[in-house]
């Protein structure tokens, strides 16, 4: 009985630590992605992130639509270099809320959803909420 309790506690602790690591990895990926793809003169400060969550509800048509929509935002660089290849069956997503200070010095609060591969190595698409 004691072994079962110890095993359960160890397993739970491992899941919590893995989850925290993935959350941090996803947040870092989003920050790096925006630092690379915001137009020059825009500065962002992050306020909050939601929990990292899996989804299987995004298809290639929706990905293309999101990419096209975001390309027309004045604070985002055009021609973002997204990963090529087939879309994974399951994507991970996280919402980020941040303040964007543009060239005019005016703050704008933005909330966007970022879709990533399961390994959390690349942003597949993102959208304005």
At which residue positions do the language-model features occur?
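Sec-dependent bacterial lipoprotein signal peptides
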Residues: 1-20
């Amino acid at each position: 009985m004691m072994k079962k309790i110890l095993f359960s506690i160890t397993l739970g602790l491992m899941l919590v630590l893995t989850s925290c690591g993935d959350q941090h990895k996803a947040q870092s990926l989003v920050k790096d992605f925006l630092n690379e793809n915001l137009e020059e003169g825009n500065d962002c400060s992050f306020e909050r992130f939601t929990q990292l969550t899996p989804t299987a509800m995004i298809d290639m048509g929706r990905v293309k639509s999101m990419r096209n929509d975001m390309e027309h935002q004045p604070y985002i660089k055009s021609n973002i270099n997204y990963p090529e290849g087939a879309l994974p069956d399951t994507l991970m997503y996280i919402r980020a809320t941040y303040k964007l200070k543009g060239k005019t010095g005016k703050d704008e609060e933005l909330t966007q959803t970022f879709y990533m591969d399961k390994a959390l190595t690349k942003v597949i698409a993102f959208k304005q909420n």
